[in-house]
């Protein structure tokens, strides 16, 4: 863990963005149990987290101890029902992915930051600014773009 001046980490993961799954509760043999499902939107959440960590390490992530801000940009493939034959959005289609099945922005953010805990920062209390954007991937591949920078850097 280090204190690094002018810390900046920026990377992209070309994969379908996944929201952090909600904890589930079950009773097994009379004992309550809390667990987080691994299957999210038909994909392995653990594999998704490993993809994020691998991209961050490749981009030079260090577990720093400085005030940080994060920007997460999630680009998702729109359902075919929203597209014309030429691949553009229908005029009746919503511009941004806001349906419940598209996932909550805060859960996308939580999935990324939880994956990077201890890899790109020491504790999530270091974040003083957070931003998440969800948009359709019409002109490029779906994926997530992550930028984490020390507060005060331009």
Positions of PLM-derived features:
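Acidic, proline/glycine-enriched N-terminal capping motif
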Residues: 1-154
